Amino acid sequence: MSKETSYPKELLCADEKVVYDAIVVGAGVVGPCVATALARKGKKVLIVEREWSQPDRIVGELMQPAGVRALRSLGMVQAINNIDACSTSGYTVIYNGEKISFAYPYKADLSPPEKIPDLVFDGNDKVVDDGTISAKEFEEDEREHGVGFVHGRFLQNLRAICAAEDRVTRLQGNVISILRNDSKEVIGAKVDVPGRGKVDFKAHMTFVCDGIFSRFRKELSTTNTSKVWSSFVGLSLHHADLPTKHHGHVILGSEHMPVIAYQISSTETRILCAYNYPTLPKNVPEWLQKEVQPFIPPSLRKSFDAALESKSYKCMPNSWLPASQNNVTGLCVVGDALNMRHPLTGGGMAVGLMDVVLLVKTIGDMDFSDREEVLNELLGFHYERKAHACVINTLSIALYSLFAADSYYLKKLQKGCFEYLGRGEDWVRQPISFLSGVLPSPYLLTKVFFTVALYSVLINFRGRTPLGFLLAIYEGFAIIFTAAKVFTPFLYEQLLQ
């Protein structure tokens, strides 16, 4: 079978003579949500994806409660159903073998997820029962829930929901370039379509959602490029015995980099091992054996060793990218193409989906042919999204700096953070709300972060001799300075970019 005939016909026959209301570039997590939402708002949408078959990736597998709430607002939450997904009810942190656990926030402490008109109907904002997901647990439990899943299965569900919309046309093809007119305004995309060659498709608005390795974020800014400071090595553990069921796990220690573990199906657990450099060690299996395996909790050791023996692993760079302002007529960049954070906290999908919710509320009811008015609203969108994006993004890099502590004072902060979280629910309520993505307050995040820093200073005085007490005073100033150094620049960048 030739390449030209190997794709379903319906993915190749988009009409280039039509001027679409919107072209969506990319059908990852964010793209289908944008396309579905706009179609339900009455827009004629073309969504272009290079490969519609199910991907095999280790990104986007743990969704925080804020992401689930956003899916409810979009009427797409049933994308987590029938994919052997696993609910998550909180986090467990293990520090040098000592364990603390905390649950996600109470629903009563939050406003209900917003039901966006035209998007939510016929109960599509409710989770349903399947083999691994309990509707009662999600809908009636007093606390919020997150969910872990195999990324590709979730993605195919999102794409299926998108494909069911009459106003959505799907196209298989490789977007070569973003089209502009003589005034440098974006007017569509040039797509290399199998069997048709290079075809120009026109639209009033073009939404770039092409993910981590975006080719087209440069259409907004050629200088705002992503930075990579560290990497994750991912392994699949089968029939693993997690220390706390239905929890995400962060495994910390004074002698090793962070390790993240969470269940993604009834039989599979993902484990991500941090490597504090952008390029991986030459011998990854040897590094895993020597630098990671000794610190794996006993209950996970058997499945981890089996994964090591298979020598099957995947690697991912941990990228950082502040958002550029959407200031080009006819163009909107959204998702990881716009903004990236460290994946340690699992907040990426939450930010992207909350951005889609805000985007639809901002421009969903507008006439996209009035492009300058849409652009004016997108300028407001840039600032309004900062509340949730700033918290999740800044928290991700600040926590990674603490959890991957590679200096004396960062280790002091790491120990203080763990002990702070262990003081009980009253102390952990706001931190877990930040981690869940449901407390979009940069002010409160700053307050809590420096409260943790001050607590680290306080416990550093314990058991000191008189001479040691004087040293602790000096170290206290150094701890606060270190905290400011790892937190303030990123907060500043997020708020003022």
Swiss-Prot record:
Its cofactor is FAD. Pathway: Terpene metabolism; lanosterol biosynthesis; lanosterol from farnesyl diphosphate: step 2/3. Gene3D superfamilies: FAD/NAD(P)-binding domain. It is a multi-pass membrane protein. FAD binds at residues 29-30, 49-50, 57, 159, 175, 336, 349. One of its GO terms (cellular component) is endoplasmic reticulum. SUPFAM superfamilies: FAD/NAD(P)-binding domain. Its main location: membrane. GO terms for molecular function: flavin adenine dinucleotide binding; squalene monooxygenase activity. It catalyses: squalene + reduced [NADPH--hemoprotein reductase] + O2 = (S)-2,3-epoxysqualene + oxidized [NADPH--hemoprotein reductase] + H2O + H(+). It comes from the Eukaryota. Pfam families: SE. Catalyzes the stereospecific oxidation of squalene to (S)-2,3-epoxysqualene, and is considered to be a rate-limiting enzyme in steroid biosynthesis. Belongs to the squalene monooxygenase family. This is Squalene monooxygenase. It comes from Eremothecium gossypii (strain ATCC 10895 / CBS 109.51 / FGSC 9923 / NRRL Y-1056).
